[in-house]
Each structure stands twice: as C-alpha cells, then as structure tokens.
Curated annotation (Swiss-Prot):
It is an enzyme of class 6 (ligase). The lineage of its organism: Bacteria, Bacillati, Actinomycetota, Actinomycetes, Kitasatosporales. One of its GO terms (cellular component) is cytoplasm. This is Phosphoribosylformylglycinamidine synthase subunit PurL. InterPro entries: PRibForGlyAmidine_synth_PurL, PurL_linker, PurM-like_C_dom, PurM-like_C_sf, PurM-like_N, PurM-like_N_sf.
Length: 752
C-alpha cells in the first residue's frame, strides 16, 4: 500500500483524486465516503488502514450495536458491578476487598485457517484483556464447537485447537478449569473457538484504558511488531468464509506464551509501583486500536512516531505497522518522571519497551513516519463513531415448519431393552461422552488454587487462602435450542450456566457472553441475533446478573450456510468458603437421591432426539426464571449448610446423563425409581430446565425436605446411591463398567 512520495496528510489534501483500495480493506463505498466527509479530504493510506480495521464488524460492532444497547438499558441493579460494558473486561466485587475481572472472546475464523496458532492467540488475547484491567490472571476456560465428530476436517481442526489452547495456557501457568466441547455438522468449516479468562485484584488496583495528562509518555512494550495478523480484524473476523478466496493464513497471528508470561509479570510489577496512568493491550487492530482508544477515552490527544516502533520485519510499511496484530504487546501511558523506572522494570523482565509518543493537550491523534505526518484524525471518529447499521431482520419462513416438526411425536422405546440400549447410545454419543481425552491435555491444577475443574458443573478457584474465598465460572450454550427459538435459546444458555454455578454452592453474580452467529446481511440471521439479545437481556434482568461485557462474532458461515445461532454465556459466582463446595460425584453409598424441579415432556432440540433420530424440531424446553432463581438459592443454602454432598444440573441428556456422570465420577452406582405420574422414558430423557439432582445424607433428609417445602420448590425422592450399576427399577440395570466403556471410549476412537 505504500506509495512514493510518502502519503502524508499534506499530500492527501493536495491529491484528492488518488484512488485508494478501500474495498480490499473491507470498507463499503458509503463508509469510505463517510471517512472523506469526516476528514474533509481523502484519507492517507495510513488513515485508511486505521479506519478500515476499526470500522470492521469485529471492532466496531456496527451491525450489533443497536441490539447490544439492551444490556445497558435492561441492566439489573447490582452492588457487585464495579466496571461494566465498554472496558477491556468487566469487573465485579467478590468481597473482602477483592475484585474479579472476567470475559469471553472468540477466535473462530483464525482457528479454522490455522488451528494451533488461532486457538493459542485466542487465549493470549483474552489473558491480555485481563491484565489490562490491573488483575493477575488466575484461570482460563474454553467453550468449543466443531463439525460432526466423524468428519475428516474435525480431525484436522480439533487436535490443533486443543493443542494450541493447552500449549499456551500451560506455558502461562494458568489452569484450564472449564468449558465445553460440542459437535454438530452446522459448525463444519466454521468451528467456534471461544476463550475466557478470570483475573483477581484488589479494588484499588483497577486500571482503565485511557490516556490523560498532557506530556505523559506513550510506551509500547512486549514483542516486536511483525507482519502476522495484518488485517485480522477486517479480513478474518468480519467476512463470510468462502473456499474460493485466496489463502488467509498470513492474517493469523503467531503466539509466544513465554513472551506473554514475561509481559504479565512486567505489567503487574509496574502496576504495583503505581507507574501506569492508562493501559491498553494490542489485540484486534493492533496499534490502530490501542492509540485511538487510549486517546479517545482520555482527556487529551496523542502524538505517535511510528519510526520508534520496534520491528521484527524492517520492510513493513506504516500501514502494515498500524494494522499488525502481532501478539504479546501492550501500550502504557506513563508520567515522564516515571518512565525510567518503567523501562527498568521492562529490562529486568527482558521485555522490549520503547517510548513511541506522548499525550497532547489537543484533541487529535497525530502519527508520524520518516518525519511526515501520515495520520491526523479525531480519535473518537476512529474508535467510537463508526457506522451503525439497523440491518433488516425478519423471522425466517422456515421457522414455523421447524417448530411444527414436534420432537415429542418421535417414536419412543417400546421395551425396557430398547430403553436400555438408547441410554447406552446416548452416553456414548460424541456430545455426551467423556471429553477427558481433550481436557487431559490441559493443566487444571497449576498454581495450586483450583478447587473444581472439568468435568464439574463449574470451575472453581480459591482466591484467598486464609478465608477460603473463591469464585466459580460456568460457560454454556445450546445452538440447537437457539435454532428452534433464539429468544428461549439464549435464556436457556444463561439458565444453565447460572444453575451450574449454583450447584457447586457459589452465588451467581454477573455475566459475560460470546455471541456467535452467521452473516448480518441475512435478515433471518439478524432476526436470530435480535431475538437472542432480547432474550438474554430480559433473563439477566430477572436473574439479577448484569452483563459486564463480551464479544460478538458474526459471519460464521461457509457460503450461504450459517451455523446455528450460538449465544455462549459465562456466569461468574462467588463462594465464601471453597471448603463448602459441592461436587458432581456421588460421595457415599446410602445417600438419598432427590430431583429438584418439575419434569415435563420436553424433547425439542434434545440430545435424545439428536442421537436416536438425528432430528431437530419442535420447541425447546420452557424457561421459568423465577424457578431458576429459587432453585439456585436452595442449592446454595443446602451446600453452605451441609445438607447435600453432591449436586448435578440437568440439561443435555436429561436425568439419566446426569446420574451416569455422577456415578462414574464417584465410582458409585445408583438405584432409581420412576416417580408417580411419569413414564420411564420422560423421567430419564426429558430436558426440562430448572432442575438438578442432589445426593442427601439420610441425617439431613428431613431438614432438606423442610427447606424445599418452605420455599415452594418441588422435590421428589428418586433413589439412592448404591452398588456398582445404574438401575432403573422395573426397567434395566447397567453396570458401571459397561457405562464407563461406552462413555470413555468414543472420543479417543474418533480422534486419537
């Protein structure tokens, strides 16, 4: 893109007729014309580079912003929320002076192009968001979705993604404590690689992304800037995949976790010495984002000299330097008298650091190269005033037919033997089978503070050794439910994550989300998106869990075929003492099994309908958010007061899936009795929401029943922990050994 002579601001003003490649950079004609209108002239090549990446779908949220406003407009009152939407990550108060920051992001398209690096840099990016808030990262989670488990391309993509996540996180010394792995043909050619991270700090250590104080220095530190990731935000993250297009591999970033580890320690030491006024990590859009966001969020302007940026490749043009998404880089604003100390800390940690500019008392972002001014813009127009589209949306014509194709009318097992066979088939199916072949590649217990990790209902980390204070996090989403009804599907995702946190004994506090959808240019996809946002915002309001931030990933489709709408929801909770946590595994024989909540004939989008009939149709389970909240309160109280020794939420696969998982984890069987008013099939396979199964010591039975009765929660005794099999009275008996073989051999057989 570089031209001779240098395309300075002065040169651009004098050459209005020069044609710039705006379309190649992802801008629409009207967007380019708006840039010209803002500047009062044509942009320079460097300015065009900045606007193109910052006005991309990935960075500007131009198609989603009009809907995302609901998260603010409907936000519930929360005393816990310290920093909300708009910063690098949300921050919540968890008590005892501690604050926790958490966020979920996506790295979907890069992970298909280059699975290992795409996934690894996804972890690196979300961890830097956490550091930028002032926190020490303490854990990561990874909700993943791939195409059909037996498809050859899944065998190409999944091992690389898993190795990238594990390799990067393990090198950072961060435990991987949660996530999901889901297989569905709709993700063929468009896997979803979502990554989340948690960080811990004291309240007074919170940092924000803003540049203030004229004369303060802008320091770029971390890795050298190279040619990797150029245009990643505008090319990879903001377009539909098309196999006919040229290779997009150069747009995938390359990660170095050891450099990131040094960056973490260096940054935290600078924070501890109060050296930093403002800070921004360099992720999507690189320096274009860091400089424009710091300048627009502060009280002044900024002047930057690109010649001072340390380069890995000396042939890079100024446009490429501004667009590069090379990893492991951060930008700090530091008072002049503290610069030497900041640079000394960087040198101690072997981190390259350079003063590249300073905060000015104006309101312009000016960038220089070889003595010429190549950028002169109002930073707000780059970072915040991009186009906002109210894209047309319409309920798709096929939605009615899809919902009318009722899963409740599918053929059901006609004998006990057939029921038994379908249970085995369910627990051995790729989505319900053990993912230990995958999760064993992650370190769950590094740092020594992990209390719960996969395959528990939520991951849990101790953050204060003396008091036992801890936090739990769960991520959930069900694209099949959302395809049937995106409003309900988003609420079901939140409900399940909320429930998964509560079953461990933690109180849900706040939400982050990763919203994965197809092309916003398709009115049917935009309808799905609008409905999902509306559903999630309404549900967060009712459950009292504000959305603290998150990510939108659009254009998740290959050609004309979009993925299922897949809102992934992360819920963070707090527990006063991790010693009182409740695990999934059955603990002792003789304990009584209770089912909490109502069971109805709800099979739309269910695991049973998929595994047995390869069917998707009907309506997803009903959502009762008041009941969900009540269930959560009872689970938390029962855990805190020692009334239950095990708890497991009921979701995909229904009761039988939950009981089998608890039995296999604890190495103890269960004898179940079908309650009056239910048939065995509905009892075992229904996916009604707002339910959990708990193991109650006999000494606590009366107290537990009294509490549930007093609060109005339906509770049904369904069996006992006993023996070395799962028995459904009058129907079948399945030895744990047979269940374990079915549950644990599927994934290695497909992928190893």
């Amino acid at each position: 893109m570089s031209r001779t002579p240098l395309d300075t601001v002065e040169h651009a003003a004098a050459t209005p007729d020069v044609e710039l490649p705006w379309a190649e950079l992802g801008l629409k004609k009207d967007e380019y014309e708006r840039v010209v209108e803002i500047l009062g002239r044509r942009p320079t090549g460097a300015e065009l580079a900045m606007y193109s990446v910052m006005w991309s779908e990935h960075c500007s949220y131009k198609s989603s912003k009009v809907h995302l406003r609901q998260f603010g407009e409907k936000a519930p009152q929360s005393d816990a929320l310290l920093v909300g939407i708009g910063e690098n990550a949300g921050v919540v108060d968890v008590g005892q002076g501690y604050a926790v920051t958490f966020k979920v992001e996506s790295h979907n398209h890069p992970s298909y192009v280059e699975p290992y690096q795409g996934a690894a840099t996804g972890v690196g990016g979300i961890v830097r968001d956490i550091i930028a808030m002032g926190a020490r990262p303490v854990a990561v989670v990874d909700p993943l979705r791939f195409g059909a488990a037996d498809h050859p391309d899944t065998k190409r993509v999944l091992p690389g993604v898993v190795a990238g996540i594990g390799g990067y996180g393990n090198c950072l010394g961060l435990p991987n404590i949660g996530g999901e792995v889901v297989f569905d043909a709709c993700y063929q050619g468009n896997p979803l690689v979502n990554a989340g991270a948690i960080g811990v700090m004291r309240h007074e250590d919170i940092h924000l992304a803003k540049a203030s104080g004229a004369g303060n220095k802008v320091i770029l530190y971390g890795a050298r800037t190279g040619g990797d990731g150029i245009g990643g935000a505008s090319i990879l993250a903001s377009e539909t995949f098309d196999d006919a297009k040229p290779s997009k591999r150069p747009a995938v970033q390359v990660g170095d976790p050891f450099q990131e580890k040094l960056l973490i320690e260096c940054t935290l030491e600078a924070f501890a010495e109060k050296l930093v006024v403002g800070i921004q990590d360099l992720g999507a859009a690189g320096l274009s984002c860091a400089t424009s966001e710091l300048a627009s969020n502060g009280s002044g302007g900024m002047r930057v000299t690109l010649d001072d940026v340390p380069l890995r490749d000396s042939t890079l043009s100024p446009e490429e330097i501004l667009m590069s998404e090379s990893q492991e880089r951060m930008c700090a604003v530091v008072e002049p008298e503290k610069v030497d100390r900041f640079l000394a800390i960087c040198e101690k940690w072997d981190v390259i650091a350079t003063v590249i500019g300073e905060v000015t008392d104006g309101d312009r972002l000016e960038i220089y190269w070889h003595g010429g001014k190549i950028v002169d813009v109002d930073p707000r127009t780059v970072a915040h005033d991009g186009p906002v589209y109210e894209r047309p949306y319409a309920r798709p014509e096929w939605q009615d037919a899809l919902q009318a194709d009722d899963a409740n009318k599918l053929p059901r097992p006609s004998s006990s033997e057939e029921l038994r066979d379908q249970v085995l088939k369910l627990v051995a199916s790729p989505n319900q089978a053990s993912k230990s072949w995958i999760t064993s590649q992650y370190d769950h217990f590094v740092q020594g503070n992990t209390v719960l990790a996969q395959p528990e209902d939520s991951g849990m980390i101790r953050i204060d050794a003396e008091s036992g204070l801890g936090v739990a996090i769960a991520t959930d989403g069900n694209g099949r439910y959302a395809k049937l009804d995106p409003y309900a599907g988003a609420q079901l995702a939140l409900s399940e994550a909320y429930r998964n946190v509560a079953t461990t004994g933690a109180k849900p506090l706040a939400v982050s989300d990763c919203l994965n959808f197809g092309s916003p240019e398709d009115p049917a996809v935009m309808w799905q998106f609008a409905e999902a946002i509306r559903g999630l915002a309404d549900a967060c309001q009712q459950l009292g869990t504000p959305v603290t931030g998150g990510n939108v990933s659009l254009y998740n489709q290959t050609g004309e075929v979009a993925i299922h709408p897949t809102p992934v929801v992360a819920v963070l909770g707090v527990i006063d003492d991790v010693a009182r946590r409740t695990p999934v595994a059955f603990q002792e024989e003789g304990q009584l099994l209770y089912l909490l909540g109502d069971t109805r004939e709800e099979f739309g989008g269910s695991a049973w309908s998929q595994v047995v009939h390869d069917h998707l149709g009907g309506l997803p389970p009903q959502v009762d958010l008041e009941r969900e909240r009540l269930l959560g309160e009872i689970l938390i109280s029962a855990s805190r007061d020692g009334m239950i020794d095990a708890a497991h939420d009921l979701s995909d696969g229904g009761l039988i899936q939950a009981v089998v998982e608890s039995a296999l984890l604890g190495g103890k069987g269960a004898r179940l009795v079908v309650p009056d008013g239910l048939d065995a099939f509905t009892f075992l396979f229904s996916e009604s929401a707002g339910r959990a199964v708990v193991a109650v010591p006999r000494s606590e039975e009366l107290r537990f029943n009294d509490m549930c009765g007093a609060r109005g929660l339906p509770v049904t005794r369904i069996g006992v922990v006993d023996g070395d099999s799962v028995e459904v009275q009058g129907e079948f008996t399945l030895p744990l050994a047979e269940l374990r073989k079915a549950h644990e051999e599927t994934i290695p057989a497909l992928l190893a």
